[in-house]
A protein has these predicted regions:
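Amphipathic alpha-helical assembly/interaction segments
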Residues: 1-166
Length: 166
């Protein structure tokens, strides 16, 4: 998967294999459910929503930077994957999805669910060991921001107050 040059630490989730798998699962879901007849569009919309929320929860959790919140959102994504697979079983049993499409979607969901479970287990291990950095670390010089320093501290000069007559 290729990305634009617009990169920053907040967009790092795009490198995660589980996020890429979730995007692939969504694309495959669109391919299969786009062909649903009009009378089943509500069901198709529910399937789109459950699958779409997986990659969104992975990204949102990643961007939160708190390990507790990250794990919470990964678990939301895992729950959405379960919801989508439950729908697949119902659609297959009602002959609304072919066996071939069911197998393709179920295989993609299975791979994604296992990836999410491994990521969650890995992060829980880091949580137990205390090996998680919850803050953004900026390694730049203050001169890039034109910060005036007085005695080793940033200037305490206040901006002029507007609107008062002297």
């Amino acid at each position: 998967m290729e990305f634009s040059e617009r990169r920053n630490i907040n967009r790092g989730y795009r490198k995660l294999k589980v996020w890429q798998d979730a995007i692939g699962y969504y694309a495959l879901t669109c391919e299969v459910f786009r062909a649903f007849p009009v009378v089943l569009q509500r069901l198709a919309a529910q399937q789109f929503a459950s699958v779409d929320s997986i990659h969104r929860n992975i990204a949102e959790g990643y961007c939160r930077r708190s390990l507790k919140e990250y794990l919470q959102f990964l678990n939301f994504g895992l729950s959405s994957a379960g919801e989508s697979v439950s729908g697949l079983h119902a659609y297959r049993n009602a002959n609304q999805v072919s066996e071939v499409d069911f197998e393709r979607l179920d295989a993609a969901a299975w791979k994604l669910e296992n990836g999410l479970k491994r990521l969650i287990e890995s992060l829980q291990s880091k949580q137990r060991e205390g090996g998680w950095q919850e803050s953004f670390v900026i390694r730049e010089s203050n001169t890039a921001y034109h910060v005036a320093e007085t005695e080793g501290r940033p200037s305490q000069r206040r901006p002029p107050v507007r609107g008062r007559k002297k």
